């Protein structure tokens, strides 16, 4: 009986191919690596698990499919290894089996099964010594960091991302390390370490600037855009998102990250629309006051009314245009996700559409989109998206309470639903380390407790304090504004601060006199600031303290945005 023939020479998996693919990953020579794989399409299409280096090639294919190579689906290639002859899989070397688990982990990531993926990567990392391949270990750490980030476990994600970066640096692969730094910068941003996040991201951008790694360069621009949006710099955010879209389009006009940037751009335009709506409302209020004071002066009133109506029409046209453009961006993103299924991305599209419909007063459409977002998120146990959907549903129900819509025989039904959604959002947010998300959940619980049905300012104050503690020193622009809204509502209700009640009865707990004095100053200065028209100079004069101290205390209690340079 003759010896078993090996595959033809052009279908052999030689060490040179694996080395070339690895070098291109390390140097971020993306087009060269993809061209190399395209030239071996026959080899990949006919990949035989019994070949030498088959499992190693599979691991490298997983890396390149993640980068952007559009070869056979990873799950299809893995099935060939599942259908091995009896006993052959068990005869794989430890190194080959680890490579197989690497590929299975990436396949799970593609399916958004993050917990399953983490299990595969934990196995790989537990046998790091047996694998003796720092390149693959660096990738495994990085991939695990990405999974943890999606689950909202930011502290641990940062640890594993740092491990991957250090391994890459140790190998001299500085460009590969820079890719991992982009994720690191986002995680630091989520922890409120904005300056460090920007510094690391800019360093990564400098290292990758001469490469054709357009997806990572797009991710950097997207990161800058999301920072700008969170700070309320919506025009700048749109510029960054447009830049990100340009980068992604160079790699693939239907890239899923391009869809994500379209969804983010829609949210930025929504931010501009909200600012414009506030200006329209302020102008209308000012016009009503002016008209009332000028009664009897018909000529002047008529001219003013015409001017106001003209400005108002222009503003409303611009408002409608912004909302229309936002929905168009979301439709374009939705079309990409239909071709490249992604539950998290599609859920975000539903969410952002719901926000725009809510702003326009279309509660039914908003409710439908928010429910779809939660349903999509629940399928993958995507806690972050589930929390956002529940907060949005809480917002919609509160809007119905204020508009007195559909109360029927039970006028409290919408208020109770709002509270239930808010409470569920808090419970879900505690599964993550997303502090701003938890703060937002507490905020909307407080706004619900303050609505016209519950009218419970004392409970709302507790929620306010929890929200303030959760967002720490770096609230996003929209959360900071909501903090102001909730704080003002609590003050208008005229409730006595629970701390003052307790102190009046001698209940001081373990606090020292100095701590009580500092807390008393926070309470009094915040209330005087509201009474004095939110003017720091008036508070300083009235209480005979320095304006600097007033600003510091207001920032500490969340009544003034930290780092605000506005003088008053």
Residue ranges: model-predicted function:
Residues 24, 68, 101, 108, ...:
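Residue at a conserved register position within TPR or TPR-like alpha-solenoid repeats
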């Amino acid at each position: 009986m003759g010896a078993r023939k090996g595959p033809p020479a052009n279908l052999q998996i030689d060490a040179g191919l694996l080395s070339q693919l690895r070098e291109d990953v390390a140097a971020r020579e993306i087009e060269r690596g993809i061209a190399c794989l395209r030239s071996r399409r026959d080899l990949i299409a006919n990949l035989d698990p019994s070949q030498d280096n088959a499992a190693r090639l599979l691991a490298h294919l997983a890396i390149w499919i993640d980068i952007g190579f559009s070869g056979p689906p990873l799950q299809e290639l893995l099935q060939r290894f599942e259908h091995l002859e009896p006993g052959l899989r068990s005869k794989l070397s430890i190194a080959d089996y680890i490579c197989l688990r690497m590929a299975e982990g990436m396949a799970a990531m593609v399916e958004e099964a993050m917990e399953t993926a983490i299990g595969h990567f934990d196995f790989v990392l537990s046998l790091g010594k047996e694998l003796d391949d720092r390149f693959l270990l660096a990738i495994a750490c990085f991939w695990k960091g990405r999974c943890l980030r999606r689950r909202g476990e930011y502290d641990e994600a940062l640890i594993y991302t740092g491990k991957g970066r250090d391994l890459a640096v140790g190998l001299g692969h500085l460009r590969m390390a820079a890719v991992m730094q982009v994720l690191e910068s986002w995680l630091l941003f989520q922890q409120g370490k904005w300056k460090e996040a920007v510094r690391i991201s800019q360093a990564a951008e400098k290292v990758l600037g001469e490469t054709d790694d357009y997806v990572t360069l797009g991710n950097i621009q997207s990161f800058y855009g999301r920072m700008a949006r969170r700070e309320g710099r919506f025009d700048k955010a749109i510029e960054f998102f447009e830049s990100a879209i340009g980068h992604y389009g160079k790699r693939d006009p239907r890239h899923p990250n391009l869809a994500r940037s379209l969804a983010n751009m829609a949210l930025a335009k929504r931010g501009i629309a909200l600012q414009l709506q506030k200006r329209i409302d302020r102008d209308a209020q000012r016009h009503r006051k002016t008209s009332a004071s000028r009664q009897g002066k018909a000529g002047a009133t008529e001219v003013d009314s015409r001017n106001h109506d003209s400005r108002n029409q222009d503003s409303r046209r611009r408002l409608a245009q912004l909302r229309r453009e936002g929905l168009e961006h979301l439709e374009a993103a939705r079309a990409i996700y239909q071709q490249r299924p992604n539950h998290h991305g599609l859920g975000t599209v539903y969410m952002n559409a719901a926000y725009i419909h809510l702003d326009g007063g279309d509660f039914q459409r908003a409710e439908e989109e928010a429910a779809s977002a939660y349903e999509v998120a629940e399928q993958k146990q995507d806690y972050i998206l589930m929390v956002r959907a529940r907060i949005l549903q809480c917002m919609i129900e509160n809007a119905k309470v204020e508009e007195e819509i559909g109360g029927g025989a039970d006028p409290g039904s919408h208020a109770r639903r709002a509270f239930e959604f808010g409470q569920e959002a808090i419970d879900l947010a505690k599964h993550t380390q997303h502090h701003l998300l938890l703060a937002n959940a507490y905020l909307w619980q407080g706004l619900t407790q303050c609505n016209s049905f519950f009218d419970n300012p004392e409970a709302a104050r507790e929620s306010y304090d929890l929200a303030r503690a959760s967002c720490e020193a770096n609230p996003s622009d929209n959360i900071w504004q909501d903090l102001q809204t909730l704080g003002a509502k609590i003050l208008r209700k005229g409730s006595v601060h629970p701390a003052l009640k307790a102190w009046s009865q001698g209940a001081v707990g373990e606090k020292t006199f100095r701590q009580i004095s500092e807390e008393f100053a926070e309470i009094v200065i915040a209330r005087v600031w509201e009474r004095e028209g939110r003017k720091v100079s008036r508070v300083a004069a009235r209480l005979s303290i320095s304006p600097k101290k007033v600003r510091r205390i207001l920032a500490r209690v969340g009544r003034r945005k930290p780092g605000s340079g506005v003088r008053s």
